[in-house]
Amino acid sequence: MADHVQSLAQLENLCKQLYETTDTTTRLQAEKALVEFTNSPDCLSKCQLLLERGSSSYSQLLAATCLTKLVSRTNNPLPLEQRIDIRNYVLNYLATRPKLATFVTQALIQLYARITKLGWFDCQKDDYVFRNAITDVTRFLQDSVEYCIIGVTILSQLTNEINQADTTHPLTKHRKIASSFRDSSLFDIFTLSCNLLKQASGKNLNLNDESQHGLLMQLLKLTHNCLNFDFIGTSTDESSDDLCTVQIPTSWRSAFLDSSTLQLFFDLYHSIPPSFSPLVLSCLVQIASVRRSLFNNAERAKFLSHLVDGVKRILENPQSLSDPNNYHEFCRLLARLKSNYQLGELVKVENYPDVIRLIANFTVTSLQHWEFAPNSVHYLLSLWQRLAASVPYVKATEPHMLETYTPEVTKAYITSRLESVHIILRDGLEDPLEDTGLVQQQLDQLSTIGRCEYEKTCALLVQLFDQSAQSYQELLQSASASPMDIAVQEGRLTWLVYIIGAVIGGRVSFASTDEQDAMDGELVCRVLQLMNLTDSRLAQAGNEKLELAMLSFFEQFRKIYIGDQVQKSSKLYRRLSEVLGLNDETMVLSVFIGKVITNLKYWGRCEPITSKTLQLLNDLSIGYSSVRKLVKLSAVQFMLNNHTSEHFSFLGINNQSNLTDMRCRTTFYTALGRLLMVDLGEDEDQYEQFMLPLTAAFEAVAQMFSTNSFNEQEAKRTLVGLVRDLRGIAFAFNAKTSFMMLFEWIYPSYMPILQRAIELWYHDPACTTPVLKLMAELVHNRSQRLQFDVSSPNGILLFRETSKMITMYGNRILTLGEVPKDQVYALKLKGISICFSMLKAALSGSYVNFGVFRLYGDDALENALQTFIKLLLSIPHSDLLDYPKLSQSYYSLLEVLTQDHMNFIASLEPHVIMYILSSISEGLTALDTMVCTGCCSCLDHIVTYLFKQLSRSTKKRTTPLNRESDCFLHIMQQHPAMIQQMLSTVLNIIIFEDCRNQWSMSRPLLGLILLNEKYFSDLRNSIVNSQPPEKQQAMHLCFENLMEGIERNLLTKNRDRFTQNLSAFRREVNDSMKNSTYGVNSNDMMS
């Protein structure tokens, strides 16, 4: 007993040190000791002691969090009886101690929610013992307000817990629990919550009473959690708020057909303090987003009418909207009016004319206060964008009145942005133009809004542009002009150029007229005239933001008016010809290229302008007709003949910039490569002339490497710039003739330099990443460009170089030792990922016969594959799925290996095979469909190989199985659980999940079943028996039909038959289970 007291005192002291000390060392020591305590065998009993006798809130918190970890662990889980005891203990503890610290209560409720979720399918005497949440909290709800708050918080936390997937348990298990909870309990909890809210609002809550305050807050959180539930398992991305539909089950219809539910929340909004209103509005946002199919047309019209009435009432009494959170949620609510309902439905609402006027006034006022809640404005612009986009399609006879109000919104946006410039400069405020992502998002929305009543938009833009341009010109000519006045006009012109680009980009071919194209011409002329003015001043001064706006304008103009699809008779070109003498597309392209060269000349040290300029050049080089017109321009010929740092400063080796700043060089050379290819043909002299600067760079690096002491920084910069240039050229050369010129130029002369760079600087990803990416591009058989003559050994020689680079990099990168977690991707995994991509490209390129390597004793293939295994084993499983690029490169490589090199896989050590199979097993449930599909393909190849080897081993043959196949069979027979687990996982996904790649899932399933017939039979019986008695026969029949006509082989005809059967099986199972709230009580199915 004394020991218990002593250890209790020690634990309490450690808790105090963990949560209260300011000394980092003491805290870390306490944390380490408490981690050991959590993992100790007597943790459970000590936690109970802490809760019973602990004198501090921190020790109670420790006990609750430790117990939560204990009940959550997947290996060695607690017995059912023990978990039931903990659940009951927690409920009693909460019921007898209402004055606990808030964070302790929260931690205990979290413990209750976790036990309930993970035990959802646990039975005791045919009773689901963890499904009595409402009964569990009834005693709390019938007591004082303090207890009522605890009861409501329990339900709220439980709903939230069940809605959230966690990484330690399979997604299939999570969805099964969530679906069962949705069908059996969620509506009852929602109804209870609404009833309690009605009671609370009917009692004239005394909001000065803090406990009643807390109760209302918890009730609103509970209601919001119910409405925010992921009803059908599709809300994987919580960051997106667009087009969000709440998939309310049909069984909830009654609650939404009853107008009092909607009215309750609007009444609450007006009767409670503004600090509570955001949650009320969040609930209304979800209610407004219920799926359309929940109602018939008449019901939807009635529901929408109530919703619009409620919105109108808020707009008529806008006092609470001065609170930023209220304002934000209300903007979201307005956006849902159009994302979920059609304009034709809105105009039929009785109060539509008043409401659209109020919404327009509210929007105009919001836009005029540009400094207030810019993130909320997104939702208002989203509403008007969708309204404007619907105008051509609306068939209702009632007037939509958008021709009156949309121009007001457009004008408010444009004028408010211009008026903001002076205030921002005067007061030194943050400039919205710095946030290019937000500006671009708003401009995309304005592009649609501004095209509605386009004549008014253009007239406004022309008027404002002419005013600002004239003032700007006068200021530039004045000797006494202040820099502030010039900056204001440049800021206003920056906004106008962005907006002009946006409205031109909003042109829709089927809805635009000659008059509108002529208006576009007016706007384009003005921007090009402004460009001539600003370009003429670049030697003295330039404005970065205005230049970025110009590039945005050019990009929009290119998309709409340049290219193969554009009608050359467009009125826009007529206007350009009249004003600027630009008679056709070729002359306009000349202006584009002139701007590109000017920017690269004057802004070569400004990365944002350089990269956007080069992106524009790259986009121009893609079009079939435009690239041919470009090549004829003297400016383009100048670029092809003078791509050196003397003419383009960004190609220089600037010691001040980072190596990563050279990325834009790849874009530049991709464009140049495309332009060169137009007329290159087989002209090797022209090619060599073009490559002279790169040849000189390679020779310079070779010269440096040949000496014992050289300037490492200069060598790195020269090499990194060079390989980035080459990667651009290699990417552009997608025809056999041109690519062979590049290959013969780089191999064998310069390949040793790349290998030497990897050898020297393997630890520096700024050097290795570009080199590895170049090699990965060179071995990529894009557009069948790597086709060597039958007498050429080049395919094998290229693979030898690939193997050499992978082996050299792989062996050296593994010597790095322990890498900090936050740097592991940059320093190690990124390079490994590129190596995997490189090896995959080489193995699947169809230009090497890999059988000859072993035949002639060449170890290139073996070295590359063994290095792959060494690199793979250095990566924890979790990292394979945590880093998307690594996932995709690994699983696509594994797919090629299992398809074409199964003998190699079969020859691996047992622990390596198990590692690979585990990675496939985990990848089957990945959220990335590409990864999941790749895993299915890998598994199919492995299972097919196994089945064939097994079939051969049972037949009497003169040639015995080779050693690898024999060992592989033996390993699989020794460890059947892994393959069985994957059978269970695949079947689980097909039955219980929204399976997006059903065909891919079906391919390995037949092999898995044939290899594990007894296990499949047990699994099937388990699923059938878990159904309600009246559904068991139907489920049994589903499984019978699945195997109907299926033979014991994996021939294509048999596989196709199985895939067809599986589609029917999935449909029948889903129909059978629709009304069932029962689940599969099978550990195999759930694990």
UniProtKB/Swiss-Prot annotation:
The keyword Cell cycle does not apply. Coiled coil: none annotated. Keywords: Acetylation, Cytoplasm, Nucleus, Phosphoprotein, Protein transport, Transport. Highly expressed in testis and spleen, moderate in kidney and liver and low in heart, brain, lung and skeletal muscle. SMART domains: IBN_N. Residues 30-96 form the Importin N-terminal domain. It comes from the Eukaryota. GO terms for biological process: intracellular protein transport; nucleocytoplasmic transport. Gene3D superfamilies: Leucine-rich Repeat Variant. InterPro entries: ARM-like, ARM-type_fold, Importin-beta_N, XPO4/7-like. Pfam families: IBN_N (PF03810). Signal peptide: none annotated. The modification Phosphoserine is found at residue 570. The modification N-acetylalanine is found at residue 2. GO terms for molecular function: nuclear export signal receptor activity; small GTPase binding. GO terms for cellular component: cytoplasm; nucleus. It is found in: Cytoplasm; Nucleus. The keyword Ribonucleoprotein does not apply. PANTHER family: EXPORTIN 4,7-RELATED, EXPORTIN-7. Binds to nucleoporins. Found in a complex with XPO7, EIF4A1, ARHGAP1, VPS26A, VPS29, VPS35 and SFN. Interacts with ARHGAP1 and SFN. Interacts with Ran and cargo proteins in a GTP-dependent manner. Mediates the nuclear export of proteins (cargos) with broad substrate specificity. In the nucleus binds cooperatively to its cargo and to the GTPase Ran in its active GTP-bound form. Docking of this trimeric complex to the nuclear pore complex (NPC) is mediated through binding to nucleoporins. Upon transit of a nuclear export complex into the cytoplasm, disassembling of the complex and hydrolysis of Ran-GTP to Ran-GDP (induced by RANBP1 and RANGAP1, respectively) cause release of the cargo from the export receptor. Belongs to the exportin family. This is Exportin-7. The gene is Xpo7.
